[in-house]
Amino acid sequence: MKGLRKLLLVLGVMLLATGVALAAGGEAASGEHHYDWTNLGFRLANFAIFIAIIYYAAGKKLIAFFGGRRKGIEQELNDLETRKTDAKKQLGDVEKRIADLENERKAIIAEYQAQGEALKAAIISKAETSARQIVEQAKKSAENEVKYAKDAMREELADMIVDATEKLLKERLDGKEQEKLIDKYLTKVVLN
């Protein structure tokens, strides 16, 4: 009902404005055509009826559509404002990270240098340990080789001494002296 009042008010204002505009044109000169007010009245009435039918048939839907559209636009504006605020915050974070990037780079370099030094020290320590083990193993191998060589030389020398002694004894001792020596040693063994 309130909408119908507005519609009638608008139509009345349009009718008056049209009448005033036509009246301002002045008196019609002789032979000139006079304006047909009846035609204008029918046209305005036709227009008013058309608007009334549209309002009656789809008024609530149009109001709901434009009201819903208004709410949708308000919601979209609020969402855009929220996104704008979030974007400003993210931009601030990115700018802060960019500002801290040099410090972060220095920290990363320092960390990797420390890791590199630790790795270098570990490698050097392992290499020194391996070198000591190799030297000790070489010393043991050399000592074993020397011991083996000494034992081989002693064995060979003992064999040579035994051979030389046998030869010397065979040359100096004859059968009688051999029997005397055997008897002498057997007597010592039996007495002891």
Swiss-Prot record:
Assigned keywords, A-Z: ATP synthesis, Cell inner membrane, Cell membrane, CF(0), Hydrogen ion transport, Ion transport, Membrane, Transmembrane, Transmembrane helix, Transport
Known role: F(1)F(0) ATP synthase produces ATP from ADP in the presence of a proton or sodium gradient. F-type ATPases consist of two structural domains, F(1) containing the extramembraneous catalytic core and F(0) containing the membrane proton channel, linked together by a central stalk and a peripheral stalk. During catalysis, ATP synthesis in the catalytic domain of F(1) is coupled via a rotary mechanism of the central stalk subunits to proton translocation.
Gene name per UniProt: atpF
Stated name of the protein: ATP synthase subunit b
PANTHER family: ATP SYNTHASE SUBUNIT B, ATP SYNTHASE SUBUNIT B', CHLOROPLASTIC
Record organism: Oleidesulfovibrio alaskensis (strain ATCC BAA-1058 / DSM 17464 / G20)
Membrane topology, from the record: Single-pass membrane protein
GO CC list: plasma membrane; proton-transporting ATP synthase complex
Pfam short name (any one): ATP-synt_B
Sequence intervals crossing the membrane: 7-27
NCBIfam families linked: ATP_synt_b
